[in-house]
C-alpha cells in the first residue's frame, strides 16, 4: 500500500501489529497514541452544525455526517500503532438498530428504544431495506471515497448477544425472561448471532484493506471483532455460562482476531469463563 497522507508509515505500523497479534515481540507494548497537530494536515471546509445537533452518531443530517468523517483525522498525529480511521457508526449497538430498534439522539450519545413487546411474535430477519442499515452503507461508501489514500475504515459498534437482546427487549424484561422463558432467550441469541454475521460479513467485504486487515479500536491483519456483555454485571456466573458463553465460543471461532470489552468490576465474576475461550 502506498503511504497514507495521515499516516505515511502505516505499513510499518501494520507490520508491528501483525507481529503483536501473532504473539511476537515488537520490543515494547503496542501503543495507540494520538497527539494534536498545531495545524490541520489539510484544509477541509466545515459545514455549519445543523440545528439541534447533539451527537456525532446522529442520522438526522447525512451531509453533516459525511463532513464530520472528512475532517475526523486532519487534526491528529498518529503514533505507535494508532492509525487514522473513521467508522460508519450509529451508536453503541448498531445491530439492534438493524434488527428493529429505533435510535433517539441524546447528549453525546444515542439511546435505543426496545422493540420486542411480545417475545413469541418476534421475527428475526435480515432487512436489506432497514433505514439504519442503508444509512450505514451510504455513509461507508462516502467514507471509502473520502478516505482513499488518507485513512482507513473501522467497523461500526455492532454489539451482540445479551446486550443486543437487552436493547431490543428492555433490560429488566430480559432479566425476567432468563427465568421465565430461557428457551426463547437461547433461540433469540442464536438468531442474533446468525444475523450479526450477515451484517459483519457485508461490512468486512466493503471496508477490509488491501492486506485483508480490519479495524476496531486497533488494527488486525484479518477479520477482527470486539465482543462484550455489559449485561453480565447483572447475572451470575452460572447464567453467563449458560446463555453468553455459547455465543462467545461461536463468535470468536468465526473471526480471525477478537478483543473483549470488559465493562467494570461487576463483570469480574466471569473472569475464569472468559479466560477459558481459546480464540479470545
Task: Briefly describe each language-model feature range.
Residues 63:
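Ligand-binding grooves and catalytic loops that recognize ribose/phosphate and carbohydrate rings
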Residues 85-122:
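A contiguous, low-structure linker/loop signature
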Residues 1-56, 66-68, 72-88, 100, ...:
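Active-site loop segments of alpha/beta catalytic cores
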